[in-house]
Amino acid sequence: MLNLAEPLGPQAVVPDLSNNPNIRGDIGDSKNQLRRLVPVTIEKGVIIPLQNVFEEQSTGFSNYNAGTLRVEKRFSQGLSFLTTYTYGKAMSDNPGWRGGGQGLSSAGAQNILNLKAEKGKADLDHTHRFTVASVYELPFGKNLHGVAKQALAGWATDAIIQLQSGLPMTPQFSGDVAQMGTNQALRPDLVCNPNLPRGEQTVDRFFNTSCLVQQTPFRYGTSGRAVITGPGTIGIDLAARKNFAFLSEKLKAQFRAEFFNAVNHTNWNPPGKQLGNSSLGRITSARDPRIVQFGLKLAF
């Protein structure tokens, strides 16, 4: 891990560069895969008498490079905040053991004998990521007394804002068109860039499905891994809290009101990526809407 930073004073720090190479990763290897594809249809029971025999290899490669701008105000005068923007790229030749992690990439390597064809964006790659975290203690009410002080003093607000671009996705289809003898998810042929301009993306056509074509039998598809970028997310979580002190500070209480996805922004789940499925390229669900919760904590 390499970090280069330049301090701008007591209130801010600007990191410049980060690099995190990792040359080990888990790859799912089907031991039933044929060494080469042959142009003949063979009954699977002949070449695969034992189904679902897999091996895990720690031979995968991953690498992360990013530039980060960070602005921080340390707590003073009741206010602190941390703001970061990261432009980064995470690459790998494996999505984790049989498509682990976010499950948006592929279920293991299409061809374990050609891992160069598996190199692409990692499952957790966010090209753009902007975050803000802040705490602000409201200044009013400190000079009040009695009931007015209990009601108006001691309030503070918290905010966490997160904007990030979408995760990569890998198109695939079920079935063994290549006749390679395994149940690993195959990829189709890619004939053009499936990613649409943002202004053309809709829930019924998030990416250009005509760019994906099922390949002819007895060969692997030409699509790379993680060639589609899913929908980005916007998260704004807010909270208000009030501290109470009773009986000469011996009994304290804190009231909290928390608003997750406070602006009720619709964050879409990834679209369908399975060729031949009616949901291909379509978004059919969304993440949680606004959630409000209240809490009371006592300390004595």
Residue ranges and their predicted role:
Residues 1-300:
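Short, solvent-exposed micro-motifs at the edges of structured domains
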